[in-house]
Regions:
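N-terminal loops that bind phosphate or other acidic moieties
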Residues: 1-191
């Protein structure tokens, strides 16, 4: 983005706080149908980002997003490191020369979500992170179309993400470890 004064650190701290406040839930969900390492991988990625806080503070917004992606790729285990890393690298590339506005944020986030779809060869309805991210992205796009205030757009986005996450409970998994469980994956929310 052209406004280099945007700091990513408050977002990283907010994500860390959210992960930590839901740590037991994340661990429980992943142990039920996943590899059981999702929480550890998320925490490892966030800790690596915070170790790079001085460097991240010196970068403009688009470069910081790209650096976040590269850091997540190199520090998080499992598929999520590659997927989240790809998302942030793509968002960084998309953010270059964009003004700070809801339309830009929507475009940047949507590009990141699309990169996960491409890398993971997945889509909504397959009991993956995309069942949360695609509704969040769609909500943000709709808010942009209706020229909503940012705070309202983000609240709508959060609600769409929660509803998307909850929708995975009755889905049959087609990707990841959960796909090997067949019908036994039903009744569990994807972590």
């Amino acid at each position: 983005m052209s406004d280099s004064s945007i700091s990513v650190l408050p977002f990283i701290h907010a994500i860390k706080d959210t992960i930590n406040s839901h740590a037991d839930e994340i661990a429980h969900l992943d142990q039920a149908i996943g590899d059981g390492d999702h929480l550890i991988n998320l925490q490892r990625g966030i800790d690596a980002l915070l170790k790079n806080r001085d460097e991240l503070e010196q970068l403009d917004f688009s470069a910081a997003l790209s650096k976040i992606g590269l850091t997540l790729m190199s520090t998080m285990g499992g598929a999520s490191g590659s997927l989240f890393g790809s998302m942030f690298v793509t968002m960084g590339k998309t953010a270059k020369e964009k003004p700070v506005a809801l339309e830009s944020i929507s475009e940047i986030f949507t590009a990141g979500v699309e990169s996960i779809k491409a890398r993971g060869k997945a889509d909504i309805g397959e009991k993956t992170m995309l069942d949360t991210l695609i509704p969040a992205s769609t909500s943000l796009q709709e808010s942009m179309t209706h020229e909503a205030e940012l705070s309202i757009a983000l609240e709508s986005m959060k609600q769409a993400a929660i509803e998307g996450m909850e929708s995975t409970e009755d889905m049959l998994a087609t990707k990841g470890r959960a796909s090997f469980l067949g019908e036994r994956a039903r009744g569990h929310i994807d972590a």
